[in-house]
Amino acid sequence: MSQATSGTSFPIFPVSDAATTATSAVATRQEIQAAAEVGLYANAEHDACGVGFVAHIKGQKAHSIVRQGLQILENIDHRGAVGADPLMGDGAGLLIQIPDEFYRAEMAKQGVELPPPGEYGVGMIFLPKESASRQACEQEMERAIKAEGQVLLGWRDVPVDRDMPMSPLVREKEPVIRQVFIGRGHDILVPDALERKLFVIRKTASSKIQSLNLTHGSEYYVPSMSCRTII
């Protein structure tokens, strides 16, 4: 008996159904065991419900890119994870270049003059509503900045629209959102070095805050901290 494939004949030998079933069962058990040991996905892998990209082909900055990014979020609303409550999803956001001119104007209102672009970083931070826990988180962030030899330039309260439709559960968990501005220290000569320092600062502060076992410490989160981009 033979079967033609791409013009070539290969012999086919019949195999009993019982043998095939037994072999498949063994393979399945081995696969399940392997998955139980290491998990279904590699630890370094991350997934997103929906992702879109907008860029200027010549690298020029434009507010239209942000507008188009917001339009993408609306267009992929069906890809967002939503539970029984349609007003409670798993979150969404934009990753953009640091808007230097905007931040420069905003921080000038506090009397803070930002260094040139690339010589400062911005951390977007979710903080607990409870005052004592929030202050403890901010203090640990400031300690981490100082310990790494960098400069605390100041904090900025991020304005939010609380009139947006929101479920009671989401409103209860809504964080205080602040941005921390960090200037480069004397030991930092290039943006790549500052980017690495910001990574260390974020990890150091987060680890310390976790170890404090604050009443509302789980509400602390840093979506981004960089001298190039912000979420």
Q: What spans do the regions from the language model cover?
A:
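N-terminal segments that mediate ammonia production and transfer
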Residues: 2-231
